[in-house]
Amino acid sequence: MNELNSVVDSAKAAFEQARTPADLENAKALFLGKSGRITELMKGMAALAVDEKKTRGAAINLAKQAIEVALNNRRQALADAELQAQLQAEALDVTLPGRQRGQGSLHPVSLTLERIEAIFGSMGFDVAQGPEIESDWFNFTALNTPEDHPARSMHDTFYVEGGTATAPNLLRTHSSPMQIRYAVQHVKRHRAAVGVGQVEGLFSGDMPEIRVIAPGRTYRVDSDATHSPMFHQCEGLWVGENVSFKDLKFVFTDFCRTFFESDDLVLRFRPSFFPFTEPSAEIDIQFQSGPLAGRWLEVAGSGQVHPNVIRNMGLEPEKYIGFAFGMGPDRLAMLRYGVNDLRLFFDGDVRFLSQFQ
C-alpha cells in the first residue's frame, strides 16, 4: 500500500509541476499511459494468488482513480488560468475616456438647400425637382431666350447625346426649366378640375396661384475660385392675378433676413436684363456688421415674368402676372460660412467639410 501511495503522491507532484496542457499530457503518460506506472503495477499481478489479485487489483484501481482525479483537477486549473490570462489581456478599463467616433453630417451646401426650402416652405412655396438633362426648348426657348443668345453656345453649355438637330439635349444651365414644367402641369390639373379639358388656347379663367421654388444642380462651362462647372441654383416663381414687384421685394427681403439671421440686412435692386423677365433686377445685400459690413454683395437675379414665358406656361399674360428670382445656394453658403473659394465645397476634403457638423 505504501508503494501505491507513493505512486499517487508522485503523480500529484508531477501534475502540479505541469505549466501547460502539453506538459500535463506528458505527465499523464508517465502514470496512466500504456507504459506508465499503473500499467506496470497491473502487469505485476500475474504471479499473485487469486485472493491477493482481488485485494491488489482493488488497491491499484483506487490509486488509479486518485491519479485521474488529480489529473482532472490540474487540467481544470490550467484551463481556468488560461481563461483568466485571456480575460486580463482583453480587459476593458471602463474608467478610461472613450475613443471619439467621427459622425457624418450633411454637406454645407445641402444644409443651405434645406434651410432655403424650409424658409420658402413657411411662405407657402412648393418645392419642385426636375431632370438635369433637359431639352433645348425647356432650357432656352420656353424661357424667351433667342437662338442667337450667347448662352446657347457650346462655350457656355454642355450638350449631350440625344434629342434632335433642332431640339438638342443638354445639361440644364439653370433650374428655371422646372418652373415651366411645374406651371404647365399646374394649369393642366386645374383645367381638368374645372372641366375645361383639352380646350385649345391659353387659360384665362380663375386659378390658384403658382408658388414654387426649384432647387437643384446645374451645369455651365466655367471653373475658377467663384465658379464651378457643376453648381447649385434655386429658382423661385410666383404667378397670380395680382402679383407685383412689391411682392418680390417683400418675399426676398424676408428670405434674406431670415436666412442670414440679420434684421438689419439691407437689400437693393439694380436694373438688369434677363430674357425671361421684364423688368429685371440684380439683388444685392449689405451686412451692417461683421467682416463683410458695408460691402454690397450680389446674391440673386430677379424680375417680372416676361409675357412670352407666361404664354409658354399655358396662361393668358393679359390676366396673369408674376415674378421670378434665381440665386446660387453655393454663393449663399460661402457668405454664411465665410468661405472664399467655391471649389473647397467640392474637393471632398474631410478636414474642411467636418467643420460644418
Swiss-Prot record:
For this protein, what is the EC number? Answer: 6.1.1.20
- Cellular location(s): Cytoplasm
Which annotated residues bind Mg(2+)?
A: E278
Q: Which family does it belong to?
A: Belongs to the class-II aminoacyl-tRNA synthetase family. Phe-tRNA synthetase alpha subunit type 1 subfamily.
Reaction(s) this enzyme catalyzes, per UniProt:
tRNA(Phe) + L-phenylalanine + ATP = L-phenylalanyl-tRNA(Phe) + AMP + diphosphate + H(+)
Subunit details for this protein?
A: Tetramer of two alpha and two beta subunits.
Q: Which domain of life is it from?
A: Bacteria
The UniProt note on the cofactor reads as follows: Binds 2 magnesium ions per tetramer.
Q: Which UniProt keywords apply?
A: Aminoacyl-tRNA synthetase, ATP-binding, Cytoplasm, Ligase, Magnesium, Metal-binding, Nucleotide-binding, Protein biosynthesis
Q: Which GO terms describe its molecular function?
A: ATP binding; magnesium ion binding; phenylalanine-tRNA ligase activity; tRNA binding
Task: Tell me which GO cellular component terms the UniProt record holds.
Answer: cytoplasm
Xref: InterPro entries: aa-tRNA-synth_II (IPR006195), aa-tRNA-synth_II/BPL/LPL (IPR045864), Phe-tRNA-synth_IIc_asu (IPR004529), Phe-tRNA_ligase_II_N (IPR004188), Phe_tRNA_ligase_alpha1_bac (IPR022911), Phenylalanyl-tRNA_Synthase (IPR002319), tRNA-bd_arm (IPR010978)
Name-wise, this protein is: Phenylalanine--tRNA ligase alpha subunit
Q: Name one Pfam family in it.
A: tRNA-synt_2d
Q: Which GO terms describe its biological process?
A: phenylalanyl-tRNA aminoacylation
Cofactor(s) of this protein:
Mg(2+)
